[in-house]
């Protein structure tokens, strides 16, 4: 009953506030009619927003009251001796107990979860902002991503920065960058920004700026990304001139050497990708070419690997038709799975890392990238792994275990002290 009383009091209080707010709104409307300057117009907008917010809150409290009264009535109904709910269609009770009621009112079946994003609309939205707020938001959603997402789950957050503003009637106002933080039950619109879509589009549009500022996601940092991208132009050039095991050599000549090189294989891959083009992604690439963005034009570009520095969950659409780029992202995903498997096999590592015995970065990346209309060439991933796999695995950050002699000495000191102060068995360090 106390909860019912609290809701009724809130309804009464909000009704009183609405009466006052509506009166203030009428007064401002009269003032604007008499003197329609910018200050009065701004006040009018804020009064309207205040009334709207109060009406929304009142409607919410009335819904809560209706739900509470309904649940109390249900509780007062006599319990069926069979244990069946009154609207259950079964004649005899199931062996399963009744679980939670899942409210699906908020779900829009015309916009099902997991649909392909509208990358052109998202790209247009992002390129309308100053670079400073974009990179700061990227930092918050990559380098500090886990904490930001955890604190704001289930809400639509706004990023604000002095570099991002718009002028309306001569008044400068903040231009917020909106990003949705969905839960597992959320349904996303095609043009709605989520952390994954944001990282994907920004990494694809501004890799040179990310490289210059050295913005790297922790997930990429621990697989040795900084080591891998060092001297990238030389590294990729060495890879491209090597003979490809999937192309057969017919005779000794310089021209023949090129025709059986990894470079020739990637050229063949690029021809195959031309048949997979989607108009929406082509429009996005044209949009990027006409403005400030710096997407790579080839896998040889110095900024090419930096497309994946903030761990986008798929290959960014701006470079999906560049031979080898989607496969390079898949290579990084496999490295993340490999490191997680190593961490799960060790005695060190966080509890979360030990739980990740089945890591699925690669499967997730593959599924999301292929939803954009291309099939990955796994032979290119194999070439990358053969060329660089051994070297980069040696640069994984694995959280060094304690030296055996140091562990033995520390344990002996623990045992000695515990015996002095307690009769309990000492724990192992």
Swiss-Prot record:
Residues annotated as site: Important for the endonuclease activity: 88, 103
Region Homomultimerization, annotated ranges: 1-79, 100-125, 373-421
Start and end residues of each stretch annotated as Interaction with host DAXX: 373-429
Enzyme category, top tier: hydrolase
Region (Interaction with glycoprotein N): 80-248
Region (Chaperone activity): 1-100
One Gene Ontology cellular component annotation held by this UniProt entry: viral nucleocapsid
Region described as Interaction with host RPS19: 150-175
This enzyme's EC code(s): 3.1.-.-
Places the protein is found: Virion; Host cytoplasm, Host perinuclear region; Host Golgi apparatus, Host cis-Golgi network
Region ranges (Interaction with host UBE2I/UBC9): 188-191
Family listed: Belongs to the hantavirus nucleocapsid protein family.
Functional note: Encapsidates the genome protecting it from nucleases. The encapsidated genomic RNA is termed the nucleocapsid (NC) and serves as template for transcription and replication. The nucleocapsid has a left-handed helical structure. As a trimer, specifically binds and acts as a chaperone to unwind the panhandle structure formed by the viral RNA (vRNA) termini. Involved in the transcription and replication initiation of vRNA by mediating primer annealing. Plays a role in cap snatching by sequestering capped RNAs in P bodies for use by the viral RdRp during transcription initiation.
Protein name: Nucleoprotein
Organism: Tula orthohantavirus
